[in-house]
């Protein structure tokens, strides 16, 4: 079972990735984690990636594909894998296909931009403990104070509205075209494509995923 999750930042992919991992016993492959692991292990690919990053350059698609190929040969991927944060662009999706990395399911989590902004901008964190609140959906007992310590809550830089809207613009220009790409792949019989309403309750999305994945 090889799965790709699509959806804007804040669409709930992380929560559902956790659910899929726990229920289907397949690893989540994050390209960011994979790059960091390769760099710290000093592998040939890791050294190439480090050289690019040290020069302030982006890691090439070829290098990421090579890392993905290497990663999915590992034992824990024999029943499948869940790709997180990759592919992000059509050239990456094409390169993946050319490298013989096939997928069974592409799951798109659709959430309107305004709801995503509300979800992310309303987050408040207690940095020392990692506890996360939301001013509307999961408020602290005392406004802007951590429930346990009473310390002040903060907003992460990534959760500020301007940053969120920039990330959404980037998503719509780069990653959203993958929706039609994978819909065409599904029509050609190369994968199953499912669009999921990401505004539903977590339990409802879980039930829908069980229905799709079996």
Curated annotation (Swiss-Prot):
Disulfide bond found in the keyword field: no
Cited InterPro entries: Adenyl_kin_sub, Adenylat/UMP-CMP_kin, Adenylat_kinase_CS, Adenylate_kinase_lid-dom, P-loop_NTPase
Cell location: Cytoplasm
Catalytic activity: AMP + ATP = 2 ADP
NMP: annotated span: 30-59
Residues holding ATP: 10-15, 123, 132-133, 200
Residue positions binding AMP: 31, 36, 57-59, 85-88, 92, 156, 167
Protein family according to the UniProt entry: Belongs to the adenylate kinase family.
Name used for this protein in its record: Adenylate kinase
Organism, scientific name: Proteus mirabilis (strain HI4320)
């Amino acid at each position: 079972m090889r799965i790709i999750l699509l959806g804007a930042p804040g669409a709930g992919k992380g929560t559902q990735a956790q659910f899929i991992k726990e229920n289907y016993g397949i690893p989540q492959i994050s390209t960011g984690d994979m790059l960091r692991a390769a760099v710290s292990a000093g592998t040939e690919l890791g050294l190439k990636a480090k050289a690019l990053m040290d020069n302030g350059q982006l890691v090439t698609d070829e290098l990421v594909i090579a890392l993905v190929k290497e990663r999915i040969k590992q034992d824990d991927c024999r029943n499948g894998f869940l790709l997180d944060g990759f592919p992000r662009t059509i050239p990456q999706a094409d390169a993946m296909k050319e490298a013989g990395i096939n997928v069974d399911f592409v799951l798109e989590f659709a959430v309107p931009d305004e709801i995503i902004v509300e979800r992310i901008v309303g987050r408040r964190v207690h940095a020392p403990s990692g506890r996360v609140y939301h001013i509307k959906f999961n408020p602290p007992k005392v406004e802007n104070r951590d429930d346990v310590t009473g310390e002040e809550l903060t907003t992460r830089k990534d959760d500020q509205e301007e940053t969120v809207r920039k990330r959404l613009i980037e998503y719509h220009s780069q990653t959203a075209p993958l929706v039609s790409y994978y819909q065409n792949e599904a029509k050609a019989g190369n994968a199953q494509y499912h669009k999921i309403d990401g505004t539903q309750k977590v339990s409802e999305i879980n039930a829908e995923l069980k229905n799709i994945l079996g």
